[in-house]
Structure formats: C-alpha cells, structure tokens
C-alpha cells in the first residue's frame, strides 16, 4: 500500500477506518459485516471478491487512501465500474470452465454460451446501476463532512475489486495520504469517527432505496 507524506501507511489508515465503520454498523443491530481482512495481511484482489460473494454480500465497500506524485492532490472520491470494463469482465466470466453458481446462486451450467453471456451481462448491468446509486448517495453524504476532489468526485474505472457480477461495489478513496493535510486528518480518531458515520448513513440510505434480498 501507499506511504504517507509523514510516514503513515495506507494499510493502517484503511483498516482503522474499516473497523470503525464495522463497529458503527453493528451497533445498529441491522447488519452483518464481513471484513476482507482484520489484521496486517495482504488479500489478493480476486480473493476479496470471492469472500464477498461467499458471504452473499448485499454491498461491497473497498476503502483506500492512495498516494500521488503530485502531493498537492487531495480530497475524497468514489469509484464504480466502467461500462467497458464491465463488458470485458462479463466475457471473461462466461469463458470460465466452471460455469455453475456464477450469478446470485443460479446454476448456469446448463445454458449455452450465448445465453450465459446475456445473463451475466444483464446481472452485471443491474449491479452497476445499484453501485452507481450508492456512489451518488456517498458523494452527497461524504460531501457534507469532508473535502471531495473537485469537478468529478464520482469516477469510473476497472478496479478488480469492483468486478463482482452480482454484488454492488464501490471503491472509496478517503483522500491522499501523500498530501499532508489529508494524511493528518485520516490519522485522527475524531475524523475517522466522523467519516465512518457518513459512510454508515450512506449505507442506511442505500438499503432504504434498495432493500436486501
């Protein structure tokens, strides 16, 4: 992971934030939270997706705090999967030898390749729409509490962790620890609590709009 302007580590900042989000969500009594990691270990990107799908997750949130060469760059941003990346991933999924249980627990092994491509594509498009809906809520809620990147805080990219075909997924860049101001904020417990609360409010709003199941 990235190293901050004053020596903090992204892996520590993001794990602390994830634990605080988990604590606040579980305090409501309405959520089961599964962490992709809960200590100082590296989990491969594909394994993170697999863990979310194995847990039958209704929502996947990947938390980051990256570094940039331009140390003036700061602010939070939200990423969801791009349309192009979606189509490429759908093709790759369809090509897998083991075709069973690939979409929301539905066995597609009896379907021909063309039908399976269509089913995977439809499932992923619906997932992308839900992801974009959550991203919109996140921009609103985070924007009330933190500085967002200018112009386009909701961005699109082909991050591997966003490619689960049946789990709405977002990647949250909390800020850039290469920027001293962002780094100082991200290492403060009070700020962490505030940001986690905005993430929890976003999740609550999302599930009101898109009830589980």
Report the location of each language-model feature.
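Catalytic-core regions of hydrolytic enzymes
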Residues: 1-113, 125-136
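Active-site-adjacent mobile loop/cap segments within catalytic or ligand-binding domains
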Residues: 69, 119-213
